[in-house]
Amino acid sequence: MKYDIIGDIHGCLQEFQNLTEKLGYNWSSGLPVHPDQRKLAFVGDITDRGPHSLRMIEIVWELVIHKKEAYYAPGNHCNKLYRFFLGRNVTVAHGLETTVAEYEALPSHKQNMIKEKFITLYEQSPLYHVLDEKRLLVCHAGIRQDYIGRQDKKVQTFVLYGDITGEKHADGSPVRRDWAKEYKGTTWIVYGHTPVKEPRFVNHTVNIDTGAVFGGRLTALRYPEMETVSVPSSLPFVPEKFRPIS
């Protein structure tokens, strides 16, 4: 099986359409379909900050749940939206407010439909996907070699948020360790979460979050070819979001 793994979309629907078309997908059915049966995989954070979060929920639900033609690993923004839809007490900030504004503008029957689709998508998707006979792992923020196969709370925190130290940068964002430098496994770990200006290959890991929602690019990794394909963002460039990893 061949896969096209898509970085953090964050509601950037036009960029997602442009990228999938560049990868050879046809949208005539209303969904991206590849003539060679390649499968899409998503590293999570499909919503928040960008303009079309709800449409991205519908598309990913159709591909993953309804048609079973794609793979989705939830990100930290997905986790927060899931908790919001469950009625938990979450702070509607850091991008969630854009998704909530879209949601609250809908009539109640459409709200219920979106809520049910996203809850189903989240609950029926694993924390990470192990594919191609354990040669490939798709997740949101990365995973340590000794965590592969585990689903406990410690692993969940790592996979959703990265290797956080508990400290904060001046802007309030968490300080993260560079786990990829220590990774010694042979399974390719493909992930996003931390915006980088260029796809970052370190050992057998690839960060493909090139900051589409911050004016960078939306990037895919073609597997097993190990080629990256990107399209430019239509949004303003926010340079401070592309922090050096250390």
Swiss-Prot record:
What's the top EC group for this one? Answer: hydrolase
List required co-factors: Ni(2+)
UniProt xrefs under InterPro entries:
Ap4A_hydrolase, Bis(5'-nucleosyl)-tetraP_PrpE, Calcineurin-like_PHP_ApaH, Metallo-depent_PP-like, MPP_PrpE-like
Q: Name one GO molecular function term.
A: bis(5'-nucleosyl)-tetraphosphatase (asymmetrical) activity
Write down any Gene Ontology CC term: cytoplasm
Q: Does the keyword GTP-binding apply?
A: yes
Write out the entry's keywords from A to Z: GTP-binding, Hydrolase, Nickel, Nucleotide-binding
State which Enzyme Commission number(s) the record gives.
3.6.1.17
Q: Which reaction does it catalyse?
A: P(1),P(4)-bis(5'-guanosyl) tetraphosphate + H2O = GMP + GTP + 2 H(+)
- Looking at the keywords, is Hydrolase present? yes
Q: Which domain of life is it from?
A: Bacteria
Annotated SUPFAM superfamilies: Metallo-dependent phosphatases
Q: Spell out the family assignment given in the record's similarity comment.
A: Belongs to the PrpE family.
The protein's job, in short, is: Asymmetrically hydrolyzes Ap4p to yield AMP and ATP.
Q: What is this protein called?
A: Bis(5'-nucleosyl)-tetraphosphatase PrpE [asymmetrical]
Q: Which organism is it from?
A: Bacillus cereus (strain 03BB102)
Higher taxonomy: Bacteria, Bacillati, Bacillota, Bacilli, Bacillales
